[in-house]
Amino acid sequence: LTANRTADFSAQADRIFGGKVENWIKFANSQKLRMALRISKANPTLAQQKAEEAVNHEVGVMTTNADNAELTLASTNPFEIIMYEYNGGDSRVSADITSYMNGYNDPRRAAMFTESTFADGGYYGIRTGINIPDGTIAHAYSNYNVKTDSKLIIMNSAESAFLRAEGALKGWNMGATAKELYEQGIKLSFEQWGVQGADAYIADNSSMPQGYKDPAGLNSYSGATSQITIAWDDADAAKNLERIITQKWIANFPLGIEAWSEYRRTGFPKLMPVVVN
């Protein structure tokens, strides 16, 4: 593709990038970077080689939200069907992500989720592995704020920045420092979701994930899943890895398969135990 990087084609034939070849190259390099991090424990030498190839390629990886891989759908967004139509619309967002974002007072909540309809409102997901409560209660928890015509996100530039941040943390040549790339990832995510306040959020060195108080009084969890804060700390590489993966997890919502893959690889984010049902 690189040899034909200017040979754009009909936008009618491309519902993701509108026929722009360079966007496809950036997407391919970003996927290559993702795969390099995935094998970084099994083959660190090859992982570094492939990651640096992707980032330092003449076209490079996704770096702005204009590069995001998003599918313009000819019909209904499948997440809208899953969350609002399938099985009586009893799917809801996870209590894990709402507990992290509530603790961080994350401005993206209103863009990502619907408010719960419990008496106190707020953003409350539902814990994994519960016995599903009756419909009235189940429907009161927060849902994914998705419309029938919402574009389907495949990969975003925020993830690319967080992947580069992890590579830089390992000492790889990622074109910037781990801190710079971590903060860039957060800013890109805020921009993607159309919210303000990224600078104040990045500087927050005290907020931590909350315990989970189930507004229905059924499955609360008082323990702290993690004490990870948001602000970068050059003195603690291990905590910075947790920061990177945690913020990537938030930025990648609702891409559950990628979240699960990274959880298996890194053990982050730290999650509540599954409720045995």
Which role fits each region the language model picked out?
Residues 190-277:
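C-terminal functional modules
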Residues 1-197, 234-239, 247:
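Structured, solvent-exposed acidic/aromatic patches
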